[in-house]
A protein has these predicted regions:
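Short, hydrophobic secondary-structure boundary micro-motifs
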Residues: 84-88, 109-112, 155-159, 202-206
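GST-like domain detector, emphasizing the conserved glutathione-binding G-site
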Residues: 1-133, 222, 232-237
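Residue-level recognition of oxygen-bearing side chains
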Residues: 72, 187, 200
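Acidic/histidine-enriched, glycine/proline-rich intrinsically disordered or flexible terminal extensions
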Residues: 208-237
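Charged/polar, low-hydrophobicity segments characteristic of intrinsically disordered regions
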Residues: 139, 198-215
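Active-site-flanking alpha-helical
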Residues: 78, 171-172, 205
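Short, solvent-exposed turn/loop segments enriched in Gly/Ser/Thr/Pro and often Arg
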Residues: 37, 163, 208-211
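GST-like fold's C-terminal all-alpha helical module
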Residues: 98, 102-197, 237
Length: 237
């Protein structure tokens, strides 16, 4: 298998999944990782577009099959290598709705909040006020939904760590960067800590990141991400 990815929340979902599958005893065989430089536009290259016409990371190439969309990749890997991450019985339907919830709600809302918070310095504050309020309020509402779920049981979909946790964690862990205050949701805060303590998660979020910056970026790295994000958000500017 080949994973074409970058150090972003959606990219980290799949790298975490690979590492968690390894820890669960799945025999993945040889897996190679190709890091895509988003700032240089490598996702728009003809080679990349052959595998994902939507020009987004991550992409998983497994034999003659190319799979786009991070949550689809999670499900594909979970079905190909059955473990407790995605059981092959009806309990999967306690898990998959939360994966889709992440893709349809948390990712877009947190992504937009992040863009207006960090990547649109050229936009006047007055023009950003409404989207910042809208996406900020909706992000807090979604965190509240997650808080209610985690008050019922230790993991998102029940008593076991699954792909639902993997799908959500990379976005929630960046709450400071997106300026979504989760400190008033103690179950979510505790969950973030517990997920981070998993060895597979630690290895997964280290893909494409210097070892000493996995949990705290240097000022130079933060500035680089701001520049890269602004370039991607406002192409041609």
């Amino acid at each position: 298998m080949e994973l074409w990815t970058s150090a972003t929340p959606n990219g980290w979902k799949v790298s975490i999944m690979i590492e968690e599958l390894i820890d669960a005893g799945a025999e993945l065989g040889n897996t190679t990782v190709k890091h895509i430089n988003l700032a240089k536009g490598e996702q728009h290259s003809p080679e990349f577009l052959t595998h994902n016409p939507n020009a987004k990371i991550p992409v998983l190439i497994d034999g003659d099959r190319s799979i786009m969309e991070s949550c689809a990749i999670l499900q594909y890997l979970g079905e190909k290598y059955p473990t407790s991450l995605l059981p092959d019985d009806n309990s999967r339907w306690d898990i998959l709705p939360w994966v889709y919830w992440q893709a349809a709600n948390v990712g877009p809302v947190f992504g937009n909040k992040l863009s207006y918070t960090r990547y649109m310095d050229a936009v006047e504050d007055e023009a950003k006020a409404h989207p910042l309020k809208r996406f900020g309020n909706e992000a807090l509402r979604l965190v509240g939904v997650l808080e209610d779920q985690l008050n019922k049981h230790p993991w998102v979909a029940g008593n076991t760590f699954t792909i639902a946790d993997i799908a959500l964690y990379p976005w929630i862990r960046g709450w400071k960067w997106s300026k979504v205050d989760i400190t008033q949701t103690p179950a979510v805060m505790d969950w973030v800590t517990r997920v981070r303590q998993r060895p597979g998660v630690g290895r997964g979020i280290a893909y494409g990141v210097p070892a000493d910056e996995v949990d705290r970026w240097s000022p130079e790295r933060r500035a680089q991400y701001r520049r890269n994000g602004a370039q991607i958000t406002n192409p041609g500017k």
